[in-house]
Amino acid sequence: MIIGVFLRYFKTYSGTNYIPLSSGSSFCGLVGNNGIGKSSILESFDSFFNGKSWNINTGLKKASTSIATSHIVPVFMIKKNELPEKYHETANYLTQLAIQFDERSVGTPLTPTTRPPVITFIEHLRKLMRNVDLTDFFIIPLGCDYDGYANLSILNGKLLTDIISPSDDEVENGRLKTTAVIGHFQILLEYLKCHYEYIYIPKDIDPETFTKLETSEIQKLMGENLEQIIQEKIPNEIISTINTGLNSFISQLERELQIYSYRTSGDRQQNLKRRDVYNLIIDAFFRIRKLNKKDSTGWTEISSLSSGEKQRAIIDIAQGFLTNHRENGDKLIIGIDEPECSLHMSACFEQFENLYRTSKNCRQLIFTTHWYGYLPTVEDGCTTSIIRNNSAHHFDLYDLAGYREEIKKKTKEAKEKIPYDIRLKSTNDLIQSIISSTLAEEPYNWLICEGSTEKLYLSHYLKDIIESKKLRIVPVGGAKEVKKIFQLLEVSHDDFKKDIKGKVYLLSDTDREILSYPVSNIEKIKCKRIINDPQTLVTSLVDIDSVKVSPSTEIENCLNGFIFSE
């Protein structure tokens, strides 16, 4: 996977920037204001992997021509047993470089311009090493410049020369010369670019065009191209039989016309080639087909769907192919720009649930978004917050399992302000999704619980009604967060109580240090605690502020032991 990327003079980014993307998770979000550079990151990977044109930052023309060059340098984290042995020596050099890199590694004093990417990279690697045992992984910071030559960004400095011990003529000003970088790392670079497949789905994509079977993106999702599919269905023997029959017909005409014959130019007569047959089949069979969605009245072409339905269809198609068709997605990285675009607020949560499931079937899923409601609900994921201050970009990477604690810590320590979006919008967007989805004609029902283990158990016991009752089970990270969500729902309830059709149930454990708060008697919103009765051996649901506060009870204390052991 890609855990981060160095960007220099690419689209929104001037100078050198390091953007951390993951500390081990395959579900990676990018948040920030419009125009701040979220989609630039996804575009850069399209240029790197797929050869799309580079969108060069205009500041490059003003920079020093002696050192300025645009580059894209992803930082890969790859299991050692997944990289061919012949690349291990080079990968070991780069892993040493990444792990040992510190403020002295560049070899020159850091300036206000060069310090931020260096510090961000160092802090990111420290965080990664806390989260992941890197014993079985290579960390490979390796990319290319505009001309396609291998590039190591700011990591090309004193530490690199110490590690690989180059000859004197390979070094200039304490750095490896471009020719030396190419000599040492170009072959590994080409392998990485070919090994991984990258699909970029921009916000303004035409869903009708994107979902056609002949597009490269759909074929990447399927894990095979149309030529391979046709070859499997129409083997060479059939094409040979067609040629034999057609040549027999031409020979018959030649006999009938005596001194005339239908021939191709030259002495060698051309037969129908395999590629000719494939192209005919693609044109006459596949190209005329469009994606249709089945509903109660029949089939509807994607062009006739609403904007929100089109956006949903793209994610549904990706998930369907990855889950049911492609053999595995180990080499596939997907970048999606604003997957919530055009969706009603009530549909955002389900869209991001689909995204999360999709991330489990590919190597990595990176997305940009303005909807923060997924932050409290995802246990295994990362989100990078991007802010700009005085034309300089700042990046903060959060692990979603504990992002609230990280925010509190950074708020106390950071010189820069933590963006309010992260602190407020994550909960507010989730509340809006819950309320709006309960107002629909076919409403959702919600079960809010403390953590991911509760969700795991509850999903098993309630599996029969998850689909039939449109039940969504959401872990929010502890009793305090359950309380916060209840109080926000309670405040909003009066405005919508006549129209609410769905139900919201908030469930907490009974902890030793009980978190008690008053709970109003609201018909469609209930807030309860689980508690065991040691006398009757029955688990009860009591109000949060009930006087029954012992024994302390967690969901594990209430499970059916036979089901649990199975």
Question: Language-model segments: which ranges?
Answer:
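Switch/communication elements of ASCE P-loop NTPase nucleotide-binding domains
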Residues: 1-56, 290-430, 435
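Hydrophobic beta-strand segments of well-ordered beta-sheets in folded domains
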Residues: 197-199, 332-334, 445-447, 471-472, ...
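Extended helical coiled-coil dimerization/tether regions that scaffold
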Residues: 195-199, 203-333
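Activity-critical C-terminal alpha-helical subdomain
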Residues: 507-566
